[in-house]
Each structure stands twice: as structure tokens, then as C-alpha cells.
Amino acid sequence: MSRTIFCTFLQRDAEGQDFQLYPGEVGKRIYNEISKEAWAEWMKKQTMLINEKKLNMMNVDDRKLLEGEMIKFLFEGHDVHIEGYTPPSE
């Protein structure tokens, strides 16, 4: 059975996560406030960040940087800035 939540990112009701995807207090907030659709958007941005900035998830500093970008993207309305990336024109 799916959960419906008010998604902070999308600013509308949407299907919530099936389980907590991220540890700690940030994870609880994501579970309660971020929809599957918004999380999928973040996953695309996260992949781009890891690849373009050559982040190593074994490195604590790189993980902290990624977590900071995630919080800014999901909760503060900031888009992820990736140097040299130009989105495809529609």
C-alpha cells in the first residue's frame, strides 16, 4: 500500500517513500517530506555530481559535500550547479 505525503520539494501531495532511504535525522525528514518523484530527480542530480566532480563515496569530505547539496536541492529550493554542464534544449 502506498503512502501519500505532502512533498516539500514538489509542493503537492505525492506518493511517499516505501522505507527510509537515508540514515539519521535527514533520512527521517526525507521519508516524511520527499516523494518518490522528487527523490528520483535528486538521484539524477546526484549521479551527475558524482561523475562530473569525480566524487569518491569512500571519502568523508565527498559524502559531506553530497549531503549538503542534497539538503539544498530537496529542502531549500537550490538547483545543483555543475560547471560546464548545459542542459539539453527542448
UniProtKB/Swiss-Prot annotation:
GO terms for molecular function: iron ion binding. Pfam families: Iron_traffic. GO terms for cellular component: cytosol. The keyword Signal does not apply. The keyword Iron applies. InterPro entries: Fe_traffick_prot_YggX, Fe_traffick_prot_YggX_sf. GO terms for biological process: cellular response to oxidative stress. Keywords: Iron. It comes from the Bacteria. Belongs to the Fe(2+)-trafficking protein family. Could be a mediator in iron transactions between iron acquisition and iron-requiring processes, such as synthesis and/or repair of Fe-S clusters in biosynthetic enzymes. Monomer. This is Probable Fe(2+)-trafficking protein. It comes from Serratia proteamaculans (strain 568). The lineage of its organism: Bacteria, Pseudomonadati, Pseudomonadota, Gammaproteobacteria, Enterobacterales.
